[in-house]
Amino acid sequence: MKTFNISQQDLELVEVATEKITMLYEDNKHHVGAAIRTKTGEIISAVHIEAYIGRVTVCAEAIAIGSAVSNGQKDFDTIVAVRHPYSDEVDRSIRVVSPCGMCRELISDYAPDCFVLIEMNGKLVKTTIEELIPLKYTRN
């Protein structure tokens, strides 16, 4: 997988996502936070919305992208998601998580040249959405 150097702005993006989920965490409601940075440097953050029926749950990345697009933002640079442990988990670490398949599709649709921060082998890694969803289906 092709990777890129982690910048101070990337670390700040992780911190914004971490602060968002730390502030809004609720068992069985919100345990993932996300932050997306636009190419102008603006950061939009969100938490996921969990539902009793799993397929109704909306991921934090989708909410962050939707919020940004709803406010006229279109040019995205980097996105990250972090997971807060449930209250009964022994390990209390908030960790960067890789986007699910649906979020990879959504990121690719709205930001095909976006960077994505993920954790790989315990290390923060910066890659492109194209690396995470190669040979993406397109209508063309």
Swiss-Prot record:
Entry GO CC: cytosol
Similarity annotation: Belongs to the cytidine and deoxycytidylate deaminase family.
Phylogenetic classification of the source organism: Bacteria, Bacillati, Bacillota, Bacilli, Bacillales
SUPFAM superfamilies linked to this entry: Cytidine deaminase-like
Enzyme class: hydrolase
InterPro entries recorded: APOBEC/CMP_deaminase_Zn-bd, CMP_dCMP_dom, Cyt/Deoxycyt_deaminase, Cytidine_deaminase-like
Protein keywords: Antibiotic resistance, Hydrolase, Metal-binding, Zinc
Pfam families: dCMP_cyt_deam_1
CDD domains with a match to the protein in the record: cytidine_deaminase
Function: Catalyzes the deamination of the cytosine moiety of the antibiotics blasticidin S, cytomycin and acetylblasticidin S.
PROSITE patterns named among the record's database cross-references: CYT_DCMP_DEAMINASES_1 (PS00903), CYT_DCMP_DEAMINASES_2 (PS51747)
EC number of this enzyme: 3.5.4.23
Superkingdom assignment: Bacteria
Active site per the UniProt annotation: E61
Name of the molecule in the record: Blasticidin-S deaminase
GO molecular function, one term: identical protein binding
Domain CMP/dCMP-type deaminase, residue spans: 8-140
Cofactor list: Zn(2+)
Positions that bind Zn(2+): C59, C100, C103
A biological process term (GO) from this entry: response to antibiotic
Catalyzed reactions: blasticidin S + H2O + H(+) = deaminohydroxyblasticidin S + NH4(+)
